[in-house]
Amino acid sequence: MKYDFSHTEKKWQAYWQEHGTFQAEEGQEKPKYYVLDMFPYPSGSGLHVGHLEGYTASDIVARYRRSRGNNVLHPMGWDAFGLPAEQYAIKTGTHPSLTTENNIRSFRETLQAMGFSYDWSREINTTDPGYFRWTQWIFLKLYEMGLAYQSEVDVNWCVELRAVLANEEVEEKIAEGLTVVRRPLRQWVLKITAYAERLLLDLDGLDWPENVKQMQRNWIGRSEGVEVDFELRCHRKMLRVYTTRPDTLFGATYLVISPEHPMAEKLATAPQLVEVKNYISKAKLKTELERTGLQKDKTGVFTGSYAINPANGEALPVWISDFVLTSYGTGAIMSVPAHDSRDWEFAKKFGLPIVEVVKSPHDVQDAVYEGKDSTAVNSSNSEISLDGLAFPEAFERMASWLELKKCGERKVNYRLRDWIFSRQRYWGEPIPVKHYEDGSLGTETDLPLRLPEVEAYQPTETGESPLANIPEWLYGTDGKGAFRRETNTMPQWAGSCWYYLRFIDPRNSEHLVDAEKEHYWMNVDLYIGGAEHAVLHLLYARFWHKVLYDLKVVSTKEPFQKLFNQGMILGEDGEKMSKSRGNVIPADHVLEKYGADAVRLYEMFLGPLEQVKPWNTNGIEGVSRFLNRVWRLVHPDTEGPAAVLDEAAMPGELLRRMHKTVKKVREDTECLKFNTAIAEMMVFVNDLHRTGNRNREAIETLVLLLAPYAPHISEELWEALGHPESIARAPFPTFDPALAANDVLTIAVQVNGKLRGTFEAAKDASKEEMLEAARAVESVRKFIEGSTVVKEIVVPGKLINFAVK
């Protein structure tokens, strides 16, 4: 019988669906394993082969864990609120819900055609009112805890989208050619900064890629420093600055405040006022990215005012520059140009003094010195001297002196900013808040608060969402009086902040999640997705989870114990797949031509899962040939029935080879080294064909090993081998450590006790064979030739030592 992948795959996909093969068990007797993909946004362009990589990896793990006896939760759903559906609605008038529904149908069909073992009974959709009522419920809890508040803030306004962007989204949108400016808007903001320290400290206990943890650490940006008060000459006020280098206070030669600082215009003297106002106006139009880029040209304006350095009494000019942000520290900095590159460039441009206060290996007038390994110089007054002290001691001494003089205090600061949570869009979760005529706020009690039907989806020119144009939804009265509903909606990130919890208990209408089920399933054992979410989704989800932990809704401090970032699959041209490049390879095309098992195997065989890899159609054809070779082990006659297999005991060599294969595949699968696991199975298949052996145990073991990787062909062969139950319920093969042990050992060779080389020898090699091999090692031979070997020491299986003179 010839292998017909199309017939086989449809047959077993129908079987799995009919029998609910992959539904997680409700009982809690088995050890659980929760493996989760970052669920997709269902776009209109469908899935391409690059999208399938992470889903294939998680499915291999899910199938493997079931075969190891775990109760596996492996769900799928849709992060379906978002801008693309709304933009399509603006163009066509099609309601976003219809577009989303069609896109979800397409995505689901592709994922099912890949044979992924999702528990589809738990499918969720963030746009379903039964789902987003709980997103709204979480928002109200944040509001009750004081973690959601309104603020008039300068936001990143995308002109083309008429929408607010989070700080983390700006760079991507500018790269897409969109225009982003700063403008003030009333916004809902989530106080993620209240959790900054916990978000930072709890990273240490997570099994995540170190680069992702470091990105979050950098984004949170914890720093220890001192807030220092500089007395403003002629103003009888203090200007407070934040510095992480109080040890360099003697080297401060000017101060810089942000354009938004409350004293910016007040500090401008009459001759400088017009220039200061113009500079502030221009700065307001720039994004943070434009203002803080290290490569940007430094700009600034002198206010005309001076402040007194508390360390040496010198009058320092106060400047305004847009590289200083009000949102970090105090919005004012002291500039030490000798030891900070940005300050040095600014000082050089505007002719400001540069004073060395950390001993430098070169002239600081020519180049900045930012090292911390040297000692303080030129840093003393009648009360304190830092000269000769290294950084830690100088920091402590100056901080203590400033506190003693009551002109400074130690402070911990974070780069992290509160999360701007509002979007001026239609297609998002309505924020369940009412605004009463007296200015007070109320909350919706009847959740979910649904979206109304609208005729036009465009945001208003004033920055409000289309909801502001629907009076019958917008206005109402209750026991407290007349109100106007909140017209902002939540960002796309909202629904993805907690979806992993809803998969545990997706149909619960009374609670977000049942406490007993949550306690059993949490936290997620393996989370697979892209590293591009390091400081967006992953940080936001951790924040919400900690809030839910404080509310005793969840029992764990963190949602995702292990995170794995798959590498990107590039187009055949070696570039990122995109419509504009024309190098996108639709998933449906390769599925139709090669079948799901070949696609699954090829994507995992391309290389290490975490690496970036180009697609190569020739490679998938090779994998397809491999599957046909596996098929012929059971069906050698393409026209006839399955072969009669040898039931006798396996030859010793093949038995050892089989146990080594089981050991290797098992270890590699557990470590997500799928490419080397597949390579090992290929070697075993070659051995079976080379020897012509059709031993039942060997072939059944191979099929069981292959099942998590290529489930359809494995199911078909398992059935042909006489097993009535699905292979999905069969246990993974075990191995005998003695039979799986390596027959070849690496032997160290020493000459007079010093390592001079190594060689490989059979485990049962004789002493004479080992000595002969040792003498033949080139790096050893030159040390013993021409010398007298007075003694030969052989430690079996480990080393040989030649004593020579």
UniProtKB/Swiss-Prot annotation:
Q: Where is the motif ('HIGH' region)?
A: 40-51
Superkingdom of source? Bacteria
Source taxonomy: Bacteria, Pseudomonadati, Chlorobiota, Chlorobiia, Chlorobiales
| Protein name, entry field | Leucine--tRNA ligase
A Pfam family assignment: tRNA-synt_1g
* Record organism: Chlorobium luteolum (strain DSM 273 / BCRC 81028 / 2530) (Pelodictyon luteolum)
Residues recorded as binding ATP, renumbered to this chain, are K579
Under the heading HAMAP family, the entry gives: Leu_tRNA_synth_B
- What keywords does the record list, in alphabetical order? Aminoacyl-tRNA synthetase, ATP-binding, Cytoplasm, Ligase, Nucleotide-binding, Protein biosynthesis
